[in-house]
Amino acid sequence: MTSSSGSLKLEIHTDDKTPGKWSVPLGDDVFRRFLSGGGGSEKAVFGEGSLFSPFLFGKYFDPSDAFPLWEFEAEVLLASLRSLGQCRVDWSQTDQAYVLKSDIPVVGKNNVQVYVDINGRVMEISGQWNSNKKAATNSDWRSGRWWEHGYVRRLELPSDADAKYSEAFLSNNDDYSFLEIRIPKINSKNKF
């Protein structure tokens, strides 16, 4: 993983008013069928060690459901992936901030977006990886079988996270983009 120096600063949106977004859950059996029938792009986006893999946390967890990431230590939750050299994500916290770092596979046009809900309690990282497939009836790819078109990871933010001062950076190379998100703590004197 690289650092945020020389990176593009992403806008963190708070105005996403998409009704029905992520309303179709990605079940374990559906995901396994999808991944087994997919090619390299699907495996790059959703494969082991990816931030968007439903199996990132050791057991199946739909990435469109909010996960309380910072309640867990990365060293513990990701130990088996790290021992196999398959981990492409890390998170930590300091006295000042919560930090998330992740490699994101470059498949097609990489259009990573970061949203924080209006209450500042859930952060959403998403993007469209397959813009060639047309959504059958939905104009917004996130309202149907979203995994066929894009990816998402929703994270519950800790109660002392000051989401309105969050920063996100994206840097690119040939195979992966590197995403770094920093969320200051409410009582931190060092807002970004």
Curated annotation (Swiss-Prot):
InterPro entries: A-crystallin/Hsp20_dom, HSP20-like_chaperone
GO cellular component: cytoplasm
Gene: HSP21.7
Similarity annotation: Belongs to the small heat shock protein (HSP20) family.
Species per Swiss-Prot/TrEMBL record: Arabidopsis thaliana (Mouse-ear cress)
Protein's recorded name: 21.7 kDa class VI heat shock protein
Subunit structure as annotated in this protein's UniProt entry: May form oligomeric structures.
Entry keyword Cytoplasm: yes
Keyword vocabulary terms for this entry: Cytoplasm, Stress response
Alphabetized PROSITE patterns for the sequence: SHSP
Protein's UniProt keywords contain Transcription regulation: no
Sequence ranges assigned to domain sHSP in this UniProt record: 80-192
Classification via Gene3D superfamilies: 2.60.40.790
Compartments (UniProt record): Cytoplasm
